[in-house]
A protein has these predicted regions:
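ATP-dependent adenylate-handling active sites, centered on carboxylate activation for C-N bond formation
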Residues: 1-133, 170-216
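Generic recognition of short, well-ordered alpha-helical interface segments
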Residues: 151, 155, 159, 163, ...
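Structural motif
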Residues: 36, 142-155, 203, 264-280
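PAPS-dependent sulfotransferase catalytic core
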Residues: 217-270
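Short amphipathic alpha-helical segments and their helix-coil junctions
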Residues: 133-147, 193, 254-271
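N-terminal glutamine amidotransferase
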Residues: 43-47, 224, 228-231, 283
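Generic alpha-helical segment signature
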Residues: 17-20, 24, 149, 153, ...
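Short Ser/Thr-interspersed hydrophobic loop/turn segments at strand-loop and sheet-helix junctions
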Residues: 156-170, 192, 282-287
Length: 287
């Protein structure tokens, strides 16, 4: 739709389902530290493809952070619903089935605790018999602003530079590509923060951007479901489950951890548990 309107050359890049392990390991090593976000793989692939034609590219990084586009922002600000109360009760009996956001489900009323819980997986640490450290203090929530703007600033100060921009910089520079994002322009940030947070209606995020886009595109396109920049990690992990299982159990680097619960991750197949297997795999590469 965008390509047709602006008469641009649109190309799609498909992440293969049969990723080679040597190829994946080479991408993991580019981070120089255990970085468990699997989106490094599509980030590397698309950077590699763009670099064949251009040396500078524009990205949308910072848009979700600036405009509250993440689900954790909505959930951190929301008041308890019947569904959330149900999840909280379920969490009491089956805590290991929940990943990030568990403190939200355990009914904490503190904004900082709610928000930081979406950036950690303490239940996974407990499965490994590791005592979780309190990470709430790592996130600085500005109490002088309203809750919505406080979360936006927290994302900009912590999540965006240390996670998203870091990843994009590593993956793009590995392909001799420079990536720039208009959403980190300080004038745009000041403009968005100058608006009253009441423009965020009925838990609808990105209203400023959506209203702007409605001038050129139809509502179905502007309000389409959010699409994350990820690949099907769950299918890939479970397709190669025996390899991961044998590899992790035989690793001498992980001997300090209690891997007896690895059987639980293997048996209880889920998106969250596939991510946990991936985290262990990445961690092993840097120990």
């Amino acid at each position: 739709i965008v390509s047709e309107k602006y008469n641009t050359n649109h190309q799609s890049v498909i992440v293969p389902t049969n990723l080679n392990f040597d190829y994946v390991n080479s991408i993991i090593n580019l981070m120089d530290e255990p970085y468990a976000d699997p989106s490094i793989i599509p980030s590397f692939i698309i950077s590699n493809e763009i670099s064949k034609h251009y040396k500078v590219a524009i990205s949308g990084d910072g848009g979700d952070e600036l405009l509250g586009g993440y689900e954790r922002t909505k959930l951190s600000l929301s008041k308890s619903s019947k569904f959330e109360n149900y999840l909280s009760k379920l969490y009491k009996f089956y805590p290991s089935y929940f990943g990030t956001g568990s403190k939200f489900l355990s009914k904490s009323s503190e904004l900082q605790v709610k928000y930081s819980s979406f950036l950690e997986d303490n239940n996974f640490l407990k499965l490994l018999k590791i005592n979780p450290q309190n990470t709430d203090s790592y996130i600085n929530i500005n109490n002088e602003l309203d809750d919505y703007k406080s979360l936006i600033l927290a994302d900009y100060q912590f999540f965006l530079p240390d996670m998203m921009m870091y990843k994009v910089d590593r993956m793009s520079m590995a392909n001799s590509l420079e990536v720039r994002s208009p959403f980190v322009d300080h004038k745009l940030i000041e403009y968005v923060l100058s608006h009253n947070s009441t423009y965020r209606k009925d838990n609808e995020n990105k209203l400023l951007l959506k209203n702007y886009l409605l001038e050129d595109f139809n509502k179905d396109f502007v309000y389409r479901k959010k699409q994350g920049f990820v690949f099907d990690l769950e299918s890939w992990i479970y397709k190669n489950l025996d390899y991961f299982y044998d590899y992790l159990l035989s690793s001498t680097k992980l001997k300090e951890f209690d891997l007896s619960s690895l059987n639980l991750l293997k048996i209880n197949k889920s998106r969250i548990n596939s991510q946990r297997i991936w985290k262990l795999y990445v961690l092993e590469k840097f120990i």
